[in-house]
Amino acid sequence: ESIEGTIKLYNNQVFIADNIKEVIPEFLMLLKGVIDCPDLPLNVSRSALQNDGFVKKISDYITKKVADKLSGMCKTDKEEYEKYWDDISPFIKFGCLKDTKFCEKMSDYVLFKNLDDKYLTFKECLEENKDKHENTIFYTNDPVQQSQYVNMFKAEGIDAVVLKDAIDQPFISQLEQKNENVKFVRIDADLNDSFTEEISEDELKDATEKLTETFKKALNRDKLDVKVQKIKDEKVSSMITVSEESRRMQDMMKM
């Protein structure tokens, strides 16, 4: 079943059309309702609507009213707002990417669900974790597949947020562009110092030499640098990490 809503347009109770994207922004197409406006042109050709200044004002007004309603709900009844968030989240984030004014109004009311299913704003994510990883927000896009890392984060008292929607990657890239010092890092992107412990120089040297030789033979490569770190959690025998930059580049190449 389609989740697309229906906005019917009328001019003095005369039906014109429905779901005209020049009037209803694409990211608000899940809305349902009626607009009756005597100033709407009866000619609904695309070119006519695109060149009609009043139509643009109506579109901006609808966007503003939706942003005001959602931000107001978040301010006055955040618990109720959270009930809707998982369903509306992709549309709000898409709207923030498409519409600068909508983004300005909604940026403080975009929520992120953490590992304990608690909803936090962008600012709250940074504030709650500034003592352990300032200006870094860790995230998981698959808590089940990345459960080993999730458990390690929980054991060390380090928080992360869940970002499972396709829109999340371009959205967090936009947030990073607007907040130059902030980085989103997937929980399997690197081995945080909190998850390692120091070992003696002799032990480190011995382990590095043995593992380097092992991997050179296995990969059939004479030139290979191996960095060895001891994982604090004895239940974890090894970890595979890919830097955030490399992984995002790989994801872009797949698109």
Question: Which residues fall in each region the model found?
Answer:
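Conserved GHKL (Bergerat-fold) ATPase module
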Residues: 1-255
